Structures are given as C-alpha cells and as structure tokens.
C-alpha cells in the first residue's frame, strides 16, 4: 500500500499536522482511518481541517490559515483531490502572511515574501486530474465578489511529497473519474 510511504515522509517534519480533507468521503472509504493511524503511530498531533469544498472559498482559507497559525502547524497534509491540495497550499502561504492573503496573492498577484514562513505541504491523492500535487498553484474562490482566481507561486510552495494510489479512486463515481482525464 503506497500509503505506507507516509511513514518515511513524516519524520522529516515537526509534531503538529493539519489534516485537510473534503466532505467526508475519505471517512466512508477508510482512507481517513488509515492516515490517522499512521499519523498517530508517528507521534503526530492532528489538527482537523475538514469540509474543504470544491473551489475552496476565501472564508475557508482565512479559517484554515488561522488554525494553522494558532496550532503552530509543522506540516499540512491534504488528503483528497485538487481542491484539497490547492487549499492546503494557499493555507501554507497565508498562515504567516503579514497582509490579507486574498488581497496580496489573488488581487494584486504578489508573490510570497522571502521572509514569510511557508508551512510544508504533503498530498495524498484520492482523485486524478488537476496536477495540483506537483505544482505551486492554488485556486481560491470569493463568492461575494464572484471571483475565482488561480495564482501560480514559486517552487517554495510546491508540495514536498505526493502519495498516489489508484485504488483510492475506485470508489469515485464514473463521471467524476472521467472528468479527471479530460
């Protein structure tokens, strides 16, 4: 099981892990329990951050960034598809941003300041198609202004590792699986 590679990656990071996931399908298919067991076996403190929706919102970004900063998170682990990965990367650069991250990164398209702490991100993919696990991009939506903006950041924002296992996609509806290929 490729999820066991998590045991090799986790020792490289501190104790506190922000566990990012979507609507709960990983709880139904057993992936959540496996990930939590591995995190606990490696002595990690888990900070739950579930409920990431497709096209994550700026409000959720603010919530996740606050959570990461207050918990002094050492690693953000996204378990899900492209939206979870995008959200995790956006949180990683926003938690210690000295300005409003929506305005700085998405309206002004500024890059991450050299002295801004970026929290490392790891991804466990449960869906195919976006490539978010291997780039520095992050798309965030602002429902109030009706804007959906993507920003590609430098290589400092790339996930540090990605774990892919085709069996994680077996429970996806056919239309969702097909959408990942096109």
Regions found by a protein language model. Name each.
Residues 5, 26, 30, 34, ...:
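Conserved active-site and cofactor/substrate-binding residues in soluble primary-metabolism enzymes
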Residues 14-17, 73, 159:
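Local beta-strand N-terminus motif with an aromatic residue
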Residues 1-18:
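N-terminal, positively charged, Ser/Thr/Ala/Gly-biased leader segments
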Residues 18-19, 75-77, 122:
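Conserved beta-strand elements of the Class I
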Residues 97-182:
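A glycine/threonine-rich phosphate-anchoring loop and its flanking beta-alpha core
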Residues 23-24, 127:
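Residue-level signal for short, function-critical loop segments
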Residues 27-101:
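N-terminal small/polar loop signature for handling phosphorylated ligands or for N-terminal nucleophile
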């Amino acid at each position: 099981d490729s999820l066991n590679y998590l045991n090799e990656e986790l020792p490289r990071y501190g104790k506190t892990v922000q566990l990012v996931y979507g609507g709960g399908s990983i709880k139904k298919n057993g992936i959540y329990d496996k990930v939590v067991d591995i995190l606990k076996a490696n002595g990690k403190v888990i900070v739950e951050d579930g409920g990431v929706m497709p096209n994550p919102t700026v409000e959720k970004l603010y919530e996740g960034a606050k959570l990461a900063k207050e918990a002094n998170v050492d690693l953000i682990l996204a378990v899900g598809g492209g939206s979870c990965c995008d959200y995790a990367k956006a949180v990683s650069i926003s938690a210690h941003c000295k300005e409003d991250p929506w305005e700085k990164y998405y309206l002004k398209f500024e890059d991450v300041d050299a002295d801004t702490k970026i929290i490392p991100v790891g991804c466990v993919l449960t869906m195919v198609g976006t490539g978010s696990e291997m780039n520095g991009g992050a798309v965030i939506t602002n429902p109030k202004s009706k804007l959906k903006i993507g920003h590609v950041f430098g290589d400092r924002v790339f996930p540090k590792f990605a774990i892919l296992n085709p069996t994680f996609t077996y429970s996806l509806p056919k239309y969702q699986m097909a959408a990942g290929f096109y």
